[in-house]
Amino acid sequence: MLSAHQAAADDTGYQLGHGWQVPDTDLTLGGYAASSLDKVQGRPWTLDVNSLSLFLWWQPLERLKLFSETELENSLTVQQRRTSSDGAYLALERLYADWTQSDALNFRVGKFLTPVGRWNLIHAAPLVWTTSRPLITFEPFPTNATGAMAYGTLTSVGAGLDYSLYGSIGKELRPNHRLDTFNKAYGAHLSYPVQDYLQVGISFANFEQINERGERKNLVGVDATWSRGGYEVSTELGWRFSSEGDNSAEKGGFIQGVAPLGGKLYAVGRYEYFRESGAQPGVNLWLAGLDYRWNRALILKSEYSKAVDNRIDAQEGFQLSVAVLF
């Protein structure tokens, strides 16, 4: 016998976390939402509605797919005796067209997530284990690019080599005023399954940013993820070099472990190091957390982080959050 939830899914064609295809159309809707309760060191408790994100997929032709992600960021902040939406911003995260030539060759044009490492490509709150994000996954480079990309899987290379090659000449589609976007950029990311449980990747990017024109930066990164039986270990390391010299260079990395505790409860631990340009020494961040993953679409996270040599005001303290994938 079907449960009420299963029956509803059968009636509407919708299942939580899988998106909803509009009947009699080629349009699919999805998205996610995330909210957090934070107690950052030295500040009062804060309740934030962090993200309300809408995904739209449209496939008018067999080979052509259009995709957009629009996100309402920080739509509501509640503190002691104060409620505000002053920080609300409607961001265009992604807007692109994909043309599928074959498994080995596809083309993308528009605004997309910069293919550096793994975290940036799967950063949606319901898909990651922690509320906070490692600094190396967003500080050294713009997380979005507007331009063109060729990507695919080369099945002739061992178990299959995934690749992305991209370029940007700036002119960001709806640039986020909080970010220093690309002026010019090109780069690549390669990912390879060494075995069934281990994926490794390398990244390279050469770029110039809008607010720092004339300064060329080279970013080199490696990433790896091992997962088996509910356990997971992941890491990313990155080095950014600058034409302005060592004082403008950045480097860092993290290693994160996840272990099942029984049922739907998981323990999470992470160590990260990050040295921002001009900052000496780098910051060391330790994190411990507990997650309750109800299913693939709904997760409750709790974590506490502590920093050493925190001269860049990296966030540390307690965070509790809930995230749902539609």
What residue ranges belong to the model's regions?
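Outer-membrane beta-barrel domain signature
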Residues: 40-44, 81-85, 135-141, 173-179, ...
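Outer membrane beta-barrel
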Residues: 16-29, 35-170, 191-196, 261, ...
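Detector for outer-membrane/organellar transmembrane beta-barrel domains
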Residues: 16-18, 22, 64, 181, ...
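Cleavable N-terminal export/targeting peptides
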Residues: 1-13
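Outer-membrane beta-barrel "beta-signal"
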Residues: 150, 292, 314-326
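Membrane-embedded beta-strands of outer-membrane beta-barrel proteins
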Residues: 52-54, 95-97, 148-150, 188, ...
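Residues that define the transmembrane beta-barrel architecture of outer-membrane proteins
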Residues: 45-50, 88-93, 142-146, 182-186, ...
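C-terminal hydrophobic structural anchor segments
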Residues: 258-301, 308
